[in-house]
Amino acid sequence: MAHAGKTRAVPPRAIIYSTGDRESPEAYEQFQDSMRGGFLPWSGKKIGDAKFRIRIEAIHVDDGFIGRVDTVDTLSVRTKSDISASSGEYVYASFNLFGTMTFEQNDEVNVSKPGDLVIFDSGRPARVSNQAARGRTCSGAIALMIPKSSFPHMDAEASFANVRIPRERLLTPLSNSLNLLTNRMPTAAGLELAAIYD
């Protein structure tokens, strides 16, 4: 299901949000309205003078999401108001493809380079900034949203509050799965993505 400038307040089966080649000065505000009105709201702002462009492709898998995000330099903020307006609690896992991502949560700051994985908590305030790689106009990441209920025997709040795993420390099976997601995300069918997600 494609959404032109808006998302629903419940988890949809699929989300495609793209500014395309639009150069409208309202493009960022339209995107922000979508993010604030979603089932897991975020706030934020654009950084710099570049025209705002973003593309999000995501699919609902089991009770979570797998997606790819390509964006110009932005700052995304998860406020207490955003958290209270959310319809669920998730663990985020962000696999950096290119560019630099800075995560601030739980009094920690983690800078993610390509190949790094950062895990953070939807139930705590957070700030995430994206900076394009040299020679590119965007940064890119594979993002997973996993319900906290998937970890019944773990203290999710203690275990997933802003943890960076550098690429050289990723376990081989996990690294292979993330790289497969990177390569297959644009064309894979839902069942195939679900198998990788599991």
Task: Describe each PLM feature range.
Residues 33-35, 53-76:
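A short glycine-rich, His/Asp/Glu-containing loop-to-beta-strand
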Residues 62-64, 71-76, 81-103, 116-117:
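Glycine- and acidic-residue-biased ligand/ion/polar-headgroup-sensing regions
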Residues 2-51, 100-198:
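Alpha-helical bundle regulatory/interaction domains
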Residues 56-57, 81-84, 108, 132:
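Short, flexible, glycine/charge-rich loop motifs used to bind or transfer phosphoryl groups or to couple energy/partner
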Residues 28, 48-52, 59-62, 86:
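Generic structural signal for well-ordered secondary structure
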Residues 57, 65-67, 91, 138-142:
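Short beta-strand micro-motifs in enzyme catalytic cores
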